[in-house]
Design a protein with these regions (language model features):
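Structural alpha-beta junctions
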Residues: 25-32, 59-72, 199-203
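A structural signal for isolated positions on well-ordered beta-strands in alpha/beta enzyme cores
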Residues: 3-5, 32-34, 72, 115
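GT-A fold catalytic core of metal-dependent nucleotide-sugar glycosyltransferases
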Residues: 77-79, 97-144, 154, 163-164
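Active-site-proximal specificity loops/subdomain of glycosyltransferases
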Residues: 41, 46-106
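Short internal beta-strands
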Residues: 32-39, 142
Length: 272
C-alpha cells in the first residue's frame, strides 16, 4: 500500500483527479490517498473544503483501477484554526492550504510512511519506485529546488514532493518546530522554509522524483507543473497546470500525459 497525502480546497479537484489518474495508470500497487482539507471562508469565499461528493468520486475512480485503492477525507478546519488561525503566514505566497501538510503528525490516521505531493503534479512512471526509497534514517526525502539551490542554499529543496518518515518526524518534532516558525516568523515561502529550517536530517534524491521543468526526460517519475522563471526574451514567470491542456501543449510542449488527460476529461464530465 502506497500512502499519499494531497491538500487543498474544493478547487483542487481537477488537480487531484488528473494526478491520481496518471498515478494509478502506471502502478499495480494499491493506493491510499489522504485528502486533507478545511473550510476557511472567513478569509476567502472560495476557500471551501473538498466535498464528500468529490472525495467519493475520486475513490470510485481509484477503485475502478484497483478495488484495494482508497480515499480518506480529513477535514482539519478546527486543528488549523488552533495551530495557525490569524498567524502572519496565512497570507503566504500561495494559500493557507500550503500549511496543511504541517499538521500531518497530529492526525492519528496518518501512517508511518507518507508521500506528500502538490496538486500540480503528474506521475510519469511507477510511483512505487519513489515510495520504496529507504528513508529509515531520515525525516524525509526531497529534491533540490530548481532556483533555490542556486539562490538560497545548495541543499534548498522543493517541498512539492516530500517522502516522509512520519515515525522519525514525530521523534524529532520536525513538524512541531515548523509550526512554531509559522506562528512566530513571517516568511515568503512559509511552508517550505519552515520545514527546511526545522529539519534535523533529510535525504536529497534525484530530480526524476520532482522534475520541475522538462517533462519529456526518460525515467522521470514525478513531473511538477510549478511556476517557472524565464529570462528570455525578457524576465517573467510562467505558470501552467496539467489540467490546462491547451496551454501545456502550446507553451510547455508537453504531450506526455495526453491519454491520462483524455481520461480526465471523460471522468470530469461524468462527475458533473
Amino acid at each position: 500500500m502506497i500512502n499519499i497525502l494531497l491538500c487543498g480546497n474544493s478547487k483542487v479537484f481537477d488537480g487531484a483527479l488528473t494526478q491520481l489518474v496518471s498515478m494509478t495508470n502506471r502502478t499495480t500497487e494499491s493506493i491510499h490517498c489522504f485528502l486533507m482539507t478545511m473550510n476557511l471562508t472567513r478569509l476567502n469565499q472560495d476557500f471551501t473544503g473538498i466535498s464528500a461528493e468529490q472525495a467519493a468520486f475520486l475513490q470510485e475512480v481509484l477503485r475502478r483501477k484497483n478495488p484495494e485503492n482508497a480515499v480518506t477525507l480529513l477535514d482539519v478546519t478546527d486543528l488549523y484554526e488552533k495551530e495557525f488561525g490569524g498567524c502572519a503566514n496565512e497570507g503566504a505566497y500561495c494559500t493557507p492550504y500550503t500549511l496543511l501538510r504541517l499538521l500531518a503528525d497530529l492526525i492519528p490516521e496518518i501512517p508511518d510512511k507518507l508521500l506528500y505531493l502538490d496538486i500540480d503534479i503528474m506521475i510519469a512512471n511507477d510511483i512505487r519506485q519513489l515510495y520504496e526509497i529507504d528513508v529509515t534514517d531520515y525525516e524525509y526525502a526531497a529534491v533540490k529546488e530548481k532556483y533555490g539551490c542556486w539562490l538560497i542554499r545548495p541543499d534548498y529543496f522543493n517541498a512539492g514532493m516530500l517522502l516522509f518518515n512520519m515515525k522519525r518526524v514525530r521523534e524529532t518534532k520536525l513538524l512541531e518546530k515548523a509550526r512554531e516558525l509559522i506562528r512566530t516568523k513571517k516568511m515568503l515561502f512559509a511552508d517550505q522554509t519552515a520545514i527546511f529550517k526545522a529539519t534535523t536530517k533529510k535525504k536529497l534524491i534525484s530530480r526524476i522524483y520532482n522534475e520541475q521543468s522538462k517533462f519529456d526526460r526518460k525515467g522521470t517519475v514525478v513531473c511538477h507543473f510549478c511556476k517557472r522563471l524565464l529570462l528570455l526574451p525578457y524576465p517573467r514567470t510562467e505558470n501552467y497546470k496539467q489540467w490546462q491542456i491547451e496551454e501545456i501543449h502550446k507553451y510547455l510542449k508537453c504531450y506526455t500525459f495526453d491519454s491520462d488527460l483524455e481520461e480526465y476529461l471523460r471522468l470530469k464530465a461524468e462527475f458533473e
